[in-house]
Amino acid sequence: VILHAANRLHSIALHNILILPDFYLPGTDTKINPFAKVEPVRSVAARIIRLREIGQTIGEIAGGEAVHPSNPRVGGMYRNVTERARMKMFDLAKEGRQLATDQMEFMIAILRNFQKRDYCVVGNAKVPMPKELGYHNQGYMAVDPMYGTNSLAEYPTWQPQRWAESRPWDWYMGEMEIDFEDPSYPIGGTTKKGGKANPQMEACTGVPTYDGQPVEVGPRARLVKFKGYDEKGTVGQHIARQLEYVDCIYAILKSLDALNTSGKVLADPIPQGDGSMGWAANEAPRGTDVHLARVKDGRVQWYEMLVPTTWNFPTCSRALTGAPWQLAELVVRGYDPCVSCATHMIVVDDDNRIVAQKLIQ
């Protein structure tokens, strides 16, 4: 739980940096540049950076690596932390408590200000702001406020029999001609007209459903399922994420208080598997992350991952329905999708000199 909450704390702070340019300083028509050297933005950026440092440091102390650890230990951890390390994590979490509260309140104020606006400037256009931006009527899926569940739990909160998966070919539209372009759209204009797009062929993930329908996973889903949260739309999604700031800190403090630094860290024995399916559903920062496997005699026979962004893609497409196309990116960023928004490709020669580069979006 400590590693998990630290990772989520770091993720929320990073997402703040990504979304702040979408919004305005209250009382102005000035969009926020999180890297500007003027107040209040400079202090906000410093706070975000410190929250990321706190999350990463606690994660490294507790689990060896904060994000995407390269050497996981099946069945537990390699070693326990020392009492000194436990107290270090306590100190970091206590420092983060006020920072997280301040950042949560700042972000909610920014979001509420944006919600009151009549328009948003994108490129050279004043785009009317729909009051129902990002709304959808899909359900929500979450298995735990902070951690997760699995097939060995007495009362598992996820059921594999309710899950199904479709091919992109069966879900998305076929080939269409691009017949519109806007060179003023940031950055560098939209895709040139005259080309073709084919989501059926270009989509690279399956389409998972739960009870036959796409679902939303992530911060809002957790708050809907476990805390009675009910705000819809893109702003509601962003606010839900900010509300998890303080949850992360208190989850860390509570777990550190209960941590026995002399306790066992590895399951004994570790089952070698009989070929039947087992699964675990974990609440990652972006949402429910389900791993399913069949293991027999210590060897993996079959493995499948249902990651948060895969769950959210079809729901996000429903949330985009009816939105001004200029605000589509804003809606998508509410889901914090784990995909590359752009790839900076460089070509170097034998002397490591850049001979060509291109930004692929």
Give, region by region, the residue ranges found by the protein language model.
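Active-site bordering "gate/hinge" segments
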Residues: 1-286, 296-297, 309-361
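Short beta-strand elements
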Residues: 289-307
